[in-house]
Amino acid sequence: MMLRELNDTQIEDLLKNQLIGRIGCHSDGITYVVPVNYIYDGLNIYCHSGKGMKINLMRKNPEVCFEVDEIKEITNWQSVIAWGQFEEITAIDEKQQVMQKLINRIMPHIVDDSVPPSHGFVDEEGDTVELIIYKIVITRKTGRFEKR
């Protein structure tokens, strides 16, 4: 077994082809890693969220990392880590475009078609919670793999 580096094409392919990645953020002595749906356009990673710990931490410290992987078995996997800056998207038209791209990317993978993708979250009282749309502007990325 030997770890090897992914080349640029392999890194791009993994980022473009996966649906779920993990964002790592840190502020005020708290490190938080959470899975997210995302899209990647070759430059930036786009995600959505409701308010909460992840958004609070990224607003305080916009330096984040993003991890995505494909694990076929314990000795056959690949992983990419990207570092970058959290930027909240506030322009309505850009938010709508990103959300539509996210929906288009995710819809083919939804097994239960009775549950449509939402354009917002609903809290415990049934009230709609505003979606926060953001991007990670990638500054660096690297990838590794193992294949026996």
Identify the meaning behind each predicted range.
Residues 1-17:
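Extreme N-terminal tail/first-helix region
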Residues 12, 37, 56, 72, ...:
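Short secondary-structure boundary/capping segments
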Residues 18-50, 66-67:
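Short beta-strand segments
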Residues 27, 70, 137-140:
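Short, structured patches in soluble enzyme cores that scaffold and shape functional sites
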Residues 49-52, 62-69, 115-121:
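Short acidic (Asp/Glu) patches
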Residues 54-61, 65-83, 87:
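Helix-adjacent hinge/juxtasegments
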Residues 78-148:
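Charged, gly/pro-rich active-site loop segments
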